[in-house]
Amino acid sequence: MAAKIKNNQYFVPLVPLHVPSSLKSESMLKPLSESKIAIIGLGYVGLPLAVAFAEKYKVIGFDINVQRVEELQKGHDHTLEVKDDLLQSVLLNHSDERAVGLYITTAGGALSDCNIYIVTVPTPTDKHNRPVLTPMIKASETIAGLLKKGNVVIYESTVYPGVTEEEMVPVLERISGLKYNEDFFCGYSPERINPGDKEHTVTKILKVTSGSTPQIADYVDALYKSVIVAGTFKASCIKVAEAAKVIENSQRDINIAFVNELSKIFNLLGIDTHEVLEAAGTKWNFLKFKPGLVGGHCIGVDPYYLAQKAQEAGYHPEIILAGRRLNDSIGKHVAQETIKWMMRKDLKVIDAKLLILGFTFKEDCPDVRNTRVIDIYHELKSFDINVDVYDPWANPAEVKHEYKITISNSLPDLGDYAAVILAVAHQDFKKLHLVKSDKQVVFDVKGVLNKDCVDARL
């Protein structure tokens, strides 16, 4: 109430203006021009992003893989996502005083004076196809031990809606002792890296961004906009951005599953699937997908993340899981169809020699993560077939470690084999002289060879 003082005058007591705590904390944000960025995880996603930011900011790239860090410190990227000359142009050493550039390390303490942390670690599934968030949790624990007021933590790893705020924020709060949206903030900007694609590189793909408050959303968006020439799209909240990413890959998985199922049907009907798709594709709104193996660390994994969250919410997803089952069956299908063709030609199956061309999960890329070529291999081996695998792109040591099989980087004599399966459409394979004959079966999984030169294709 107003108080009465002499001469019948009144005054109103001054009440302190209440400023929301989040706004007070946001005032602690460093201007982007003064920011130092930490990239946690330097794989197919993290390294290209780190290099892009390093052209405008001081960046610390962190990875727990000592061999990977040593390779990058020497200016070489075995994934081939970043050209060596570009990587070398931004690399900094420990004593380098340049204002911008990339310093790569395995030492978590080197991140201590960063104010923006970007997490780009893998999000795999276990053998039961359940999401594994351990890499994200470990990364969050590392960051939490260094977190200071005014810092921003941005996640890029593909997850189901809610992971950032429901799973990672509690880790950050517990270890740091800081309060979310008062002392520190979060953002989510899903990665859209397409391994092996030299046209759609990280800065040329439109980036979805989001933040834990409207002000932080603007901050995160401005950060990415400063390096992404394709532009950005600011989502309304973190969960929307998370959901958008996981359905990108789920939609593609389902569309490929549809044409894979068509391939099985048309094979029984004696119709060429690729010719059907070509004819149907003459309509303007027909979606053009081709049958094939669906592997890699994204399309073959991410639908399980969405399915997990749906089941937690009490809904059993039908189409998503059906698509996964269908696509996971294709490797076995290819092997069995090849064996049928061998029998039609009266070729010996048991102890026969068979060559698989390609082992990576996609063409012209060294990435062997979650490759479904392994399904073809195992199914053939179950028939006591002697299987050789040739892939000039894949690292034999990595394949041996991950899959316990031996592959070769040297092309053998194609004539030595009763059957050849072209599993991955590397450009070099398209130049090989593969011709069907009475003594050899040729199966073209991707449909890239002349139809008249092969016995079968999906």
Name each model feature, range by range.
Residues 2-5, 10-13, 23-458:
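Structural/interface elements that position substrates and couple domains in central-metabolism enzymes
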